[in-house]
Amino acid sequence: MDITSIAWGALMVVFTFSLSLVVWGRSGL
């Protein structure tokens, strides 16, 4: 596994996490 795929994987995880956090905040949970 090279550094590029590691960086992309981390970016996807952070993006998904922040997106779900925004959805949670707007739901009022």
Swiss-Prot record:
Transmembrane feature ranges: 3-23
InterPro entries for this protein: Cytochr_b6-f_cplx_su8_sf, Cytochrome_b6-f_cplx_su8
MF term (GO), any: electron transporter, transferring electrons within cytochrome b6/f complex of photosystem II activity
Coiled-coil segments: none
Subcellular compartments: Plastid membrane
Pfam families: PetN
UniProt record, GO biological process: cytochrome complex assembly
A single cellular component GO annotation: thylakoid membrane
Function comment: Component of the cytochrome b6-f complex, which mediates electron transfer between photosystem II (PSII) and photosystem I (PSI), cyclic electron flow around PSI, and state transitions.
Family note: Belongs to the PetN family.
Subunit (UniProt): The 4 large subunits of the cytochrome b6-f complex are cytochrome b6, subunit IV (17 kDa polypeptide, PetD), cytochrome f and the Rieske protein, while the 4 small subunits are PetG, PetL, PetM and PetN. The complex functions as a dimer.
Protein name: Cytochrome b6-f complex subunit 8
Organism encoding this protein: Aneura mirabilis (Parasitic liverwort)
High-level lineage: Eukaryota, Viridiplantae, Streptophyta, Embryophyta, Marchantiophyta
